[in-house]
């Protein structure tokens, strides 16, 4: 595992010692090399996890998430270049250092064997993200957004620490690989119910569950482009990863406790999709759509069948690449028009025809068109939820229809229509942006050729 962590950490001195005109080239090129080295993780045995040492391991659940994390750093660096063009070199280097630090912490989160190490890294990812949002965000509301983000996640995850200390005292170990075999079946007593809530709440806030999701649109809208990308693509997946890991220790209580949360996520899925239809702000629309996609993942994880687990992991990876691409597209619009309001950015197909192609592809993957892995994930989730309870097909069907509606709305509002007076002279799209979109969409399409690598440990 050190072959990923040490090169990532060594990107920091590389950035600080680069000449001013080579900052972006050096950091992007070397982070791309690191992300290609992550392909080595795919070479795994079918029946077991790879234990690198006592503290790091990877199995078919954490491997795709790890690869997504490493793949995202060069993309974030590519996306941030024009955002930081007016900043002095020291601040550029500081920004890049924050992103690198975030990636190192995420790698350690996804590979930790020890639950306390997982918790510490899970909390530590908060710090660079918060600095990125509150320092480089666009409006002054970014401080408010940072406050929401900080307190929602901290209040959610404090009970988790208490629960972990309790687990350590009762079982004597917090190793994932041991606890799966040692954990005593939890009965439905009051203390166990609170224990279950304490374990799950941190991840439900991070996912976010409908009702605990208010920090997410705020943080997304105010964050700079790299902040939005890493928040949508990886930080939401931390919640899903933690839930998948910790539910195996909370049985059979989960079957008893999951009902309110299942209902909340299924209802919240419809609600957030409907909220998307009334959005004026482009980034806010994409943020709410990712809440509705993550609600599917919560429902799938709480049902706890092999199919739903496979659907949840597939949907997490697919959503990571898709929503990250949508945020990049929204940002490329924002850099030209300096407004996120959709009414002011109409008719861009005439002005930026190739960008319209990327918009179309991103929208189609967002509404889960057949060849993509989004469809694989959604089908598995819908089938497993249907076999858990038949009437849920109404909610699922409604959600799929509304998803198609708001995606179409987003596409038509940005690409079609009569363009407004103030965008007659905008900059053409750069090769860098096209490369960025291609690097998002190519992995999505390639994964649809062989989806079994992202179907998780139960495949």
UniProtKB/Swiss-Prot annotation:
One of the GO BP terms on file: mitochondrial electron transport, NADH to ubiquinone
Organism: Balaenoptera musculus
Function: Core subunit of the mitochondrial membrane respiratory chain NADH dehydrogenase (Complex I) which catalyzes electron transfer from NADH through the respiratory chain, using ubiquinone as an electron acceptor. Essential for the catalytic activity and assembly of complex I.
Family label: Belongs to the complex I subunit 4 family.
Subunit structure, as described in the record: Core subunit of respiratory chain NADH dehydrogenase (Complex I) which is composed of 45 different subunits.
The keyword Transmembrane helix is annotated on this UniProt entry: yes
Highest taxon, organism lineage: Eukaryota
Localization of this protein: Mitochondrion inner membrane
This protein's GO CC annotations: mitochondrial inner membrane
Catalytic activity: a ubiquinone + NADH + 5 H(+)(in) = a ubiquinol + NAD(+) + 4 H(+)(out)
EC number: 7.1.1.2
Main location: mitochondrion
Protein name in the entry: NADH-ubiquinone oxidoreductase chain 4
Transmembrane segments annotated in the record for this chain: 22-42, 60-80, 92-112, 113-133, 147-167, 193-213, 224-244, 257-277, 284-303, 307-329, 350-370, 393-413, 435-455
Keywords for the protein's UniProt record, in alphabetical order: Electron transport, Membrane, Mitochondrion, Mitochondrion inner membrane, NAD, Respiratory chain, Translocase, Transmembrane, Transmembrane helix, Transport, Ubiquinone
Topology of this chain in the membrane: Multi-pass membrane protein
Record-level Gene Ontology MF annotations: NADH dehydrogenase (ubiquinone) activity; ubiquinone binding
Record gene name: MT-ND4
